[in-house]
Amino acid sequence: MRNQNIIYVPFGVMLEPNEYKEYLEQGWYPATNDIWFQTRSTRINLELYKPTKTVLRLAKKIKYFPDVNMTPAKRERLARIYDKYIAHKGYSDDMSIDDIISNSHGHIYYVYNNEIVAFAFHKVVEDAYLGIEFAWDYGEPKLSLGHVNVYYNSLFARFKRCKYIYLSSGYESCSIYKS
């Protein structure tokens, strides 16, 4: 395969709300409120999910707050966490905190030592709880906040009578916490 080129073409589709569930089950995920993209999404069946003892122990160290109101001070703190997160992961900054907020129905933020250290934005589509964005500041890596976030998302998803949690794309080693 000499002299072969790979052409990357981003592909998205605009859906009606009554189509969300069908497309979600086929591997599509919301990039924005209007545009969905095809991905290898990770899905947790809530009937089968059981957190480990380690996750339950770590979760006790973290205070969590479900919230739908966004104050300017909190927005600024979450933006700083997001900036640290994408820098730590080496990701490109293709979304702003405002994009994330507008593409969600609500969020959870996590407090450790009286500081907000992480957040998770979500939306609900029928019986599915979708993780829109999760980020943390990596100030205390031993907290394993990715695993703790999955646990708390499972509690909120069950409360909202969801059957599944979708945690967006799952590629490579950076998504191991989703498994």
Language-model features: locations:
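Acyl-donor binding region in acyl/amide transferases
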Residues: 2-22, 104-106, 116-119, 123-179
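Acyl-donor-binding surface of acyltransferase catalytic domains
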Residues: 1-69, 73
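A conserved beta-strand-loop-helix scaffold within acyl/acetyltransferase catalytic domains
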Residues: 57-142, 156
